Amino acid sequence: MAELTIRPEEIRDALDNFVQSYQPDAASREEVGTVSVAGDGIAKVEGLPSAMANELLKFEDGTLGLALNLEEREIGAIVLGEFSGIEEGQPVQRTGEVLSVGVGEGYLGRVVDPLGNPIDGLGEIATESRRALELQAPGVMVRKSVHEPMQTGYKAVDAMVPIGRGQRQLIIGDRQTGKTALAVDTIINQRDNWRSGDVNKQVRCIYVAIGQKGSTIASVRGALEEAGALEYTTIVAAPASDPAGFKYLAPYTGSAIGQHWMYDGKHVLIIFDDLSKQADAYRAVSLLLRRPPGREAYPGDVFYLHSRLLERCAKLSDEMGAGSMTGLPIVETKANDVSAFIPTNVISITDGQCFLESDLFNAGQRPALNVGISVSRVGGSAQHKAMKQVSGRLRVDLAQFRELEAFAAFGSDLDAASKASLERGKRMVELLKQPQYAPFPMEEQVVSVWAGTTGKMDDVPVEDIRRFEAELLEFLRRERKDLLTSIAEGGKMSDDTLQSVADAIAAFKQQFETSDGKLLGEG
């Protein structure tokens, strides 16, 4: 029988190998905290010394919380969901994760909550990956100047305050002045681009509803579906009934979904409706977490709340795929006061604003755009060349009309030139009126604006202007389709093109009958 011998060196080597290759069990150690205060959508948690800012926490019933305040003895967290089941003394676990949302093409045509969960009853969403809500905005070196137009379909906006892809254009005004209608019509106006199948033309749209009535969100969804625009739109809904934490997070969820497409080389339009309610929700959360209040009781970082959100909208350089995300934030004012805290903050962050005025709205001017204080700082370089060519005089003419109108109200005698300017101004104001859910293609806008600014409608009675425009465009679509196509596909209009437009208008006038039964051609 062979002698069995074990040398000490072999034992030592075996122990060394075992120690080096030892893998401990996964659940070796975890931190568990305790809820000390709960209520009103927030929770104070003791006993999680290693928790990080914006880390997700998990409560006993599976509800998630977001760590916002990291204090010496406790953590202040907002509860993401129903907080009635969270009580003092319950255990809380760290997850080691930050808040993220699923992204991908599966979100098109769907309605989701601020955590990315579907709430439209159409089943689960197939996601491609997950994206953190708090991601750095694109840096200066990966951006490109705005140079492509983003058509809204509104003559007043596309002619005087043009918007480019990658721009942030604020829509501001009192309640019930048509802010949401302008945003929804801009989404609907992207329909033909989407159906063209051209990736460079297609725009994916995201509508973020913050603190809106549930019925309002449902009506927006219905309008988009009826217009055939829901197929390329995602709705992120945080209605008024949702906790303040959801209303605070909803815009970041929408921008995370949009950023995924932007970095993929696609074009995105995102609407935040509206950021006043997000600021109110953030103020409520901050006051509940005992953060020191500042002006109008908003916390000190409320500017950063909006700046870090809106800076994510950008036009990326060709090296980054040339994608873009255009932002249309909406802010509600009180009594047309644009000098309040939140409006001035957002005005200073954005690249321009469309100011909608309740007096104009009530006077029947829709969209109720106040041209005097509405401005687009970067959109001019993105405006279609034909539109730029015909709309140059429009803003000046309207400003002169407003001055003359105020002057004429005193009953003073006006010279012939002033009277002519006043009459043309009345027709231009009438021409810029537009019904909801009826956006105009760019080439038809160009024809309408050119006809108005060059005096081709001066002999049309004011009450017939809109009917004249509608029938003229129908005549052009039927008889001179080639002319509209050449305007749409070309750049600046040549003298020959302008002459062709003038001839077409003259030919149409021969058959247009005014409301008093008179043919314009006879005049």
UniProtKB/Swiss-Prot annotation:
- Main localization of the protein? membrane
What chemistry does it catalyse, as a reaction equation? ATP + H2O + 4 H(+)(in) = ADP + phosphate + 5 H(+)(out)
**Membrane topology term:** Peripheral membrane protein
Localization of this protein? Cell membrane
Q: Name one GO molecular function term.
A: proton-transporting ATP synthase activity, rotational mechanism
Spans through the membrane: none
Entry EC number(s): 7.1.2.2
Q: Where is the signal peptide?
A: none
GO CC terms in record: plasma membrane; proton-transporting ATP synthase complex
Partners and quaternary state? F-type ATPases have 2 components, CF(1) - the catalytic core - and CF(0) - the membrane proton channel. CF(1) has five subunits: alpha(3), beta(3), gamma(1), delta(1), epsilon(1). CF(0) has three main subunits: a(1), b(2) and c(9-12). The alpha and beta chains form an alternating ring which encloses part of the gamma chain. CF(1) is attached to CF(0) by a central stalk formed by the gamma and epsilon chains, while a peripheral stalk is formed by the delta and b chains.
Q: What is this protein called?
A: ATP synthase subunit alpha
Q: Which organism is it from?
A: Streptomyces griseus subsp. griseus (strain JCM 4626 / CBS 651.72 / NBRC 13350 / KCC S-0626 / ISP 5235)
